[in-house]
């Protein structure tokens, strides 16, 4: 379920009848709870990709409901956390991030490429939902996965439209360069989709001025 997917705020839910896994904390947590019938006990955890406000801006609200939150060490250090509850640091083990088991969900974190401290993407598997690839805010997808049932992937901008918006004065050159260095273009997204075995695909984090 997509609850928010833009620079205004990102939040997604993978769920079955008994469990829910949150991806990102970028919208008011009350909206997340409303989507889950106000059943906070159904939530087995929340995964955060990086510290930017549209992805982690509501992290304290999630923590205050005593929902387990998981993120990289760099993300936790950079996020503005003032809750008395703390996120769990996803550790590196022998050059790879540790795998997580949250309820019936198995999570494999992997590094992504963004202008943040230590961004991650996640492969999530559940017996009822199969394999889901979640990757957002990255200019390149370094990993491939087989047997995917769903892909939630960033598709942020069209390079030609981005260049035209600079020429016409709609956005500054510095913003263009930041977008190119930290977000996934249409064409790079297509390359990533071709490299992965997939069924349904959902595009996330579409940005209005660059599409």
What is the predicted role of each segment?
Residues 1-38, 120-137, 150:
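Conserved beta-strand hairpin/beta-sheet module of binuclear metal-dependent hydrolase folds
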Residues 23-26, 44-51, 70-73, 133-137, ...:
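Active-site neighborhood of phospho(di)ester-bond hydrolases with catalytic His/Asp-centered motifs
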Residues 28-74:
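Active-site metal-binding motif and surrounding structural segment of the metallo-beta-lactamase
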Residues 70-100, 105-110:
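Glycine/small-residue-rich loop that forms an oxyanion/phosphate-binding "nest" at active or ligand-binding sites
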Residues 98-154:
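Catalytic core of the metallo-beta-lactamase
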Residues 173-184:
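A short acidic, glycine-rich active-site loop
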Residues 192-193, 198-199, 211:
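Terminal, non-globular segments
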Residues 204-210:
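Conserved small/polar residues in nucleotide/adenosyl-binding loops
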């Amino acid at each position: 379920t997509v609850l928010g997917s833009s620079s205004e705020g990102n939040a997604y839910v993978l769920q079955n009848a008994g469990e829910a896994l949150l991806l990102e904390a970028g919208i008011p947590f009350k909206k997340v709870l409303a989507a889950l019938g106000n059943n906070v006990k159904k939530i087995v955890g929340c995964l955060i990709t990086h510290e930017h406000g549209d992805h982690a801006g509501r992290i304290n609200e999630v923590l205050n409901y005593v929902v387990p939150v998981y993120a990289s060490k760099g993300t936790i250090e950079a996020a503005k956390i003032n809750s008395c509850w703390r996120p769990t640091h996803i550790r590196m083990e022998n050059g790879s991030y540790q795998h997580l088991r949250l309820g019936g969900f198995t999570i494999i974190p992997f590094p992504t490429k963004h202008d943040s401290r230590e961004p991650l993407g996640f492969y999530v598997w559940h017996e009822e939902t199969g394999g889901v690839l979640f990757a957002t805010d990255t200019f390149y997808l370094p990993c491939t996965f087989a047997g995917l049932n769903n892909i939630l992937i960033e598709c942020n901008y069209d390079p030609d439209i981005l260049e035209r918006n600079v020429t016409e004065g709609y956005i500054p050159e510095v913003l263009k360069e930041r977008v190119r260095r930290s977000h996934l273009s249409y064409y790079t997204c297509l390359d990533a989709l071709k490299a992965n075995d997939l069924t349904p695909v959902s595009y996330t984090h579409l940005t209005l001025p660059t599409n």
